[in-house]
């Protein structure tokens, strides 16, 4: 269970809501609430990897240790069993490992500092990963609970995405 001031749902409920939100982004149903994520979704080549990453992103929650690191390791074992290619498996593992990174940078760091953007870009490494991480992060945050996503968070996420995309 992850009931606290921030989370309104159990991990499994959160995961299913996040997958539904991801679908809403893909179909355009959330265009007003998540315009940048909706805009970049058609450009994403690794949609299957994105959905699997969303399914598995909190798989290690509740275990002792860093759930992102542990979940990335689980993905390396599970993804091939699901029929994903080596490249898709690596993408899923990378997304799970870094699924908290974009929100952490956007909400806690100075986005006007070029070093912040350069450091983030060096981890992301490609436009495809940037798009994947943006969409995953938006869906993950929106699935935490009602009224968690707001204009301030949307603006910071957009600013980080656009700044990194320009690098």
Regions found by a protein language model. Give the residues of each.
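Divalent metal-dependent catalytic cores for phosphoryl transfer on phosphate-bearing substrates
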Residues: 10-11, 37-166
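Amphipathic alpha-helical
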Residues: 7-29
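Short amphipathic alpha-helical interaction/hinge segments
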Residues: 26, 30, 104-107
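Alpha-helical bundle cores of large, well-folded domains in eukaryotic cytoskeletal
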Residues: 1, 16, 20, 45-47
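Non-catalytic interface/linker regions that flank or bridge core catalytic/transmembrane domains
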Residues: 1-7
